[in-house]
Amino acid sequence: XVAFETVPVDLMKGEHKQPAYLALQPFGTVPAVVDGDYXLLSAVLDVYEAHLHGYLAGDFVSLADLAHLPFTDYLV
């Protein structure tokens, strides 16, 4: 269990484009993960990238395989 603090950012008010937030997250996107003086932007993006490409070529199941699953009942 890691202690953390959630700070809400009001996107409708443009709080993610304010200089204070841009100092934490230069792209002005959400989320921004900060641990002391260390911003974890690259680590968060790496996890996101891994989730996006979890079933591409080279893995046990590919996206093409998943796309054909709804039609397998017609083959049986």
Swiss-Prot record:
> Which InterPro entries does UniProt cross-reference here?
Glutathione-S-Trfase_C-like, Glutathione-S-Trfase_C_sf, Glutathione_S-Trfase_N, GST_C, Thioredoxin-like_sf
Give UniProt keywords alphabetically: Cytoplasm, Transferase
Example GO CC term: the record gives:
cytoplasm
What residue ranges carry the coiled-coil annotation?
none
For whether the record's keyword set contains Transmembrane helix, the answer is: no
EC code(s) of this entry: 2.5.1.18
Please list the residue ranges annotated as the GST N-terminal domain.
Answer: 1-40
Q: What are the subcellular locations of this protein?
A: Cytoplasm
Q: What is the first-listed, main subcellular location in coarse terms? A: cytoplasm
Enzymatic class: transferase
Listed under GO biological process in this entry are: glutathione metabolic process
Catalysed reaction, written as an equation:
RX + glutathione = an S-substituted glutathione + a halide anion + H(+)
Q: Does the keyword Transferase apply?
A: yes
Top-level lineage group:
Eukaryota
Which residue range or ranges hold the GST C-terminal domain? 41-76
Matches recorded under PROSITE patterns: GST_CTER, GST_NTER
An annotated Gene Ontology molecular function: glutathione binding
Function, please?
Answer: Conjugation of reduced glutathione to a wide number of exogenous and endogenous hydrophobic electrophiles.
In the record, the note on similarity to other proteins reads: Belongs to the GST superfamily. Theta family.
Name of protein: Glutathione S-transferase
